[in-house]
Amino acid sequence: MKSILQQPIWRYYDQSISAKQRSPLESFATDDTLCQLVGQLVSPPTIRTWVHEASVVLGIQDHRLPYVQQGMDLLESRGYQPIVRNSGGLAVVLDEGILNISIVLSEQMDSLSINDGYDVMVDLVKGLFPEVAEKIEAYEIVGSYCPGSYDLSIEGKKFAGISQRRLRQGVAVQIYLCIEGSGSQRAALIRDFYEESLQQEETKFNYPQIVPEVMASLSELVDLHLTVEGVVIRLQQLLHRLAGEVHPESFHDEELTLYGFYLKRVFERNAKMLERHE
């Protein structure tokens, strides 16, 4: 376990239940707010857990698909709410079997390279699942949705993807952990979205050719009874081992004002993206 996870104080913001019925855009605004607060040393380093109901978060490149509206209609017909985010990255699935974790750190005292940021999250995940830590590998899983060099897998099957957000000297390292349900069914949903949105038309950007069988949930990969709720408890226990103090804290009044600023910005940018498409 790298020393960067061993902090005198970890702030812990649990939205694994409270965020479920809210828009994922609210989670992006929350992490932007935490980036500024932690980056400017107003808040201690923070770990946030969050879960949303069935949604698919699309990136800028996804929104440029030639028939993206048909693709979004397909997602809605399958019970998933499409959300467009004004950022890089490609389509990812959110639902109640997926636990998202954000680690928010400050670069004000020490810079954190891109790879170091990813490594912190890999270490956290291995700490969460010591029973299978040696089996967890980080490399790009070709055929998965939103592929990246820090895809986490066991025996070639991806169960998690990591991204980063940097703002106001703060770094938010974010992971989606597929804990419950079928990873291949989620991948098939995104495969169908791309097929409907491309309709065999050639594009300059190479969208992923998704092979559902290369994705799985942790419940499918390990001989453990895992639930989202249970993994949240594992995380809380791990934090208490890593930190001198753990402060469970949501936003207080002054922080809510800043959150309101970022929330407005996120929703305005999302609206502009949708306007451009229309």
UniProtKB/Swiss-Prot annotation:
Its EC number is 2.3.1.204. Pathway: Protein modification; protein lipoylation via endogenous pathway; protein N(6)-(lipoyl)lysine from octanoyl-[acyl-carrier-protein]. InterPro entries: aa-tRNA-synth_II/BPL/LPL (IPR045864), BPL_LPL_catalytic (IPR004143), LipL (IPR024897), Octanoyltrans_LipM/LipL (IPR050664). It catalyses: N(6)-octanoyl-L-lysyl-[glycine-cleavage complex H protein] + L-lysyl-[lipoyl-carrier protein] = N(6)-octanoyl-L-lysyl-[lipoyl-carrier protein] + L-lysyl-[glycine-cleavage complex H protein]. It comes from the Bacteria. The record marks 158 as: Lowers pKa of active site Cys. Keywords: Acyltransferase, Transferase. Belongs to the octanoyltransferase LipL family. Catalyzes the amidotransfer (transamidation) of the octanoyl moiety from octanoyl-GcvH to the lipoyl domain of the E2 subunit of lipoate-dependent enzymes. This is Octanoyl-[GcvH]:protein N-octanoyltransferase. It comes from Lysinibacillus sphaericus (strain C3-41). The lineage of its organism: Bacteria, Bacillati, Bacillota, Bacilli, Bacillales. The gene is lipL.
